[in-house]
Design a protein with these regions (language model features):
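Conserved ATP-binding subdomain of kinase catalytic cores across diverse folds
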Residues: 1-74
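Conserved kinase catalytic-core segment
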Residues: 10-26, 78-142
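Generic, well-ordered alpha-helical scaffold segments in large soluble proteins
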Residues: 22-29, 49, 66-69, 85, ...
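Small/polar glycine-rich anion-binding or flexible loop at a beta-alpha turn
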Residues: 39, 182-193
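Catalytic-core segments of enzymes that bind and process phosphorylated/nucleotide-bearing substrates
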Residues: 62, 66-85, 124-179
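Regulatory N- and C-terminal appendages and interdomain linkers associated
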Residues: 129-131, 143, 173, 190, ...
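Short, surface-exposed acidic
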Residues: 176-185, 206
Length: 206
């Protein structure tokens, strides 16, 4: 995974913060986050979503756990299987739309550490499942590395070199019309095109 393959550069907390804010503006459900400054370093802090407001634990299962998928098997699983799981759990349509946005966002920002442990589900006290907020959402790409040179999960049968028709086809699998899929892609991509503004606001400089 990214921890094995990519170094944790100084200032990565700032990068995570910028991407978290960008993802939220792209319509992705993100936990509240902030930066903690300490000793000249910036630490990315995010509120735990597997706890209630009173601190009680919520049951959480990753896609890997709930489907018995091996997250080390790069390319063995697909975003379509995440959608299939959402349907099998009987989750609402908004969760399908959420997962669509997250897949598109990962492709647009080259978050290629998008393995099956980075999608999760929460069960509340009544036993009802929901898609958890997104996490580990940041640029992760190493063209010479065995792990993140391609996406960990495929989409429309591909792990790289996606085009708009691939995203529309995935939207069709999610149950969206072509028009709706294109609208969601546009909404998700708009903040990505403003990366420099998010980076500057977070203090990320070239």
């Amino acid at each position: 995974n990214r921890d094995k393959e990519l170094a944790d550069p100084q200032g990565f907390g700032l990068i995570e913060y910028a991407f978290s804010r960008m993802a939220a503006d792209a319509g992705i459900d993100m936990s509240e986050c902030r930066l903690h400054q300490e000793g000249g370093r910036s630490h990315f802090m995010t509120r735990r979503f597997d706890r209630t407001s009173t601190g009680d634990k919520l049951h959480m299962q990753s896609l890997a756990a709930i489907r018995h998928f091996d997250f080390n098997a790069a390319g063995a699983y697909a975003y379509e299987q995440a959608i299939e799981t959402i349907r099998r759990l009987g989750l609402p349509a908004v969760d399908i739309e959420q997962q669509f946005r997250r897949a598109i966002f990962n492709i647009l920002i080259r978050n290629q550490d998008d393995h099956v442990k980075n999608i999760a589900f929460l069960m509340d006290r009544t036993g009802a499942w929901r898609l958890s907020p997104a996490y580990d959402v940041a640029y992760a790409y190493n063209p010479s590395g065995p792990w993140t040179r391609q996406h960990q999960m495929s989409l429309n049968g591909k792990r790289d070199d996606f085009d708009l028709e691939d995203l529309v086809a995935f939207g069709g699998y999610c149950g969206f019309s072509r028009r709706r899929a294109l609208a969601l892609v546009a909404e998700t991509s708009a903040p990505v095109s403003a990366w420099r503004a998010y980076a500057d606001d977070a203090g990320v400089y070239e």
